[in-house]
Amino acid sequence: MAEAAALVWIRGPGFGCKAVRCASGRCTVRDFIHRHCQDQNVPVENFFVKCNGALINTSDTVQHGAVYSLEPRLCGGKGGFGSMLRALGAQIEKTTNREACRDLSGRRLRDVNHEKAMAEWVKQQAEREAEKEQKRLERLQRKLVEPKHCFTSPDYQQQCHEMAERLEDSVLKGMQAASSKMVSAEISENRKRQWPTKSQTDRGASAGKRRCFWLGMEGLETAEGSNSESSDDDSEEAPSTSGMGFHAPKIGSNGVEMAAKFPSGSQRARVVNTDHGSPEQLQIPVTDSGRHILEDSCAELGESKEHMESRMVTETEETQEKKAESKEPIEEEPTGAGLNKDKETEERTDGERVAEVAPEERENVAVAKLQESQPGNAVIDKETIDLLAFTSVAELELLGLEKLKCELMALGLKCGGTLQERAARLFSVRGLAKEQIDPALFAKPLKGKKK
């Protein structure tokens, strides 16, 4: 007996839902869909079949009264959305903060968590108070406990003993060093004070042999009368060595030139009157130190005093002839008798110092030349003072600003500042050699103008 045909419902795009009867009861889904697509004139490959929302195999038998849905297939694209979906899912899974979410009752989880934490904190309030009170009691107990001191430490006692011994040794060494410095300072101070004492003694011993500067023709006879003996002695010992040269500057109408090379800048020249058979009277500046040096040199060379005098006279006459033609006027320097005495005393002191120098050192004595360029320079050279004769800064201040400036310039030091500053600067180099002076006190050399 033939099986009854099955009646099924088919639903698809474009025709809605309709009932279709199959040819036989054992008809497959593939045959049923293929015949329907032919009737609708659509390709069967563009659909897939679902039954009750699930895909079915096309080889299954058609069920009576079932509803079959034809779902059109979508044309697949290039793809690439899968990677984006995976990245988004990873970000969602990474976060653990769900407080912004809401529970089933609509409350945010953040508020719910805060209420739970507040209830827990209120519940533990009593425990916290008890713990705080316990800590306070423990702190009081620690403060009330007496410290355990140990006063029998052998190491500490040993350290104290060693420190006491080292302190005693250090004090003794310091006292010895201080006493040695005091003794050396007293010795050096005594040595510095010997020079003024010696100069005062020499001043009293040689008061009869005083010499003065020749101020002009009007005072020539007075100078000859008062210093005849000393002039005769000095004229015999006139210097003629290679290290000493003489030039006669023109003074007044006589036309005699007077200049000399000195062993040191601080020594003073003294005038000696010498008669050599001519009506003109020659005046030659001589220093005690130069006389000693020249006598030794003449003794070594075997020259006689007469030969030395004749050579000196010849050189002086030649110089007079040359200077008489030029006729350059030179201002005379007014000098008092008291100033001449002080200068002569300083000359004797300097001469004695040079005389005490060894013979081999006398040959190395520096020779300075008097400059006659300007009257101001002549004043500076002639009035150079002996700093050893001053014992305080106040005495140097009595010299005045200009005199202190000249002395500082002669030493190559800075000459600016007030009267007190100049006097203090000059007093600080008293008795010091040029190498011992602080380099900061020297004046800076003048720089040429840039072209």
Curated annotation (Swiss-Prot):
Upon binding to PCNA, the N-terminal UBL (ubiquitin-like) propeptide is cleaved at Gly-77 by an unidentified deubiquitinating enzyme; the resulting mature SDE2 is degraded by the DCX(DTL) complex in a cell cycle- and DNA damage dependent manner. Ubiquitously expressed; enriched in brain, lung and liver. Residues 396-430 form the SAP domain. A motif (PIP-box) lies at residues 39-52. Residues 182-208, 222-362 are annotated as: Disordered. GO terms for biological process: cell division; cellular response to UV; DNA replication; endonucleolytic cleavage of tricistronic rRNA transcript (SSU-rRNA, 5.8S rRNA, LSU-rRNA); mitotic G1 DNA damage checkpoint signaling; mRNA cis splicing, via spliceosome; protein processing; protein ubiquitination. Interacts (via PIP-box) with PCNA; the interaction is direct and prevents ultraviolet light induced monoubiquitination of PCNA. Interacts with FBL/fibrillarin. Interacts with CACTIN. Interacts with SF3B1. Interacts with U2AF1. This is Splicing regulator SDE2. It comes from Homo sapiens (Human). The gene is SDE2.
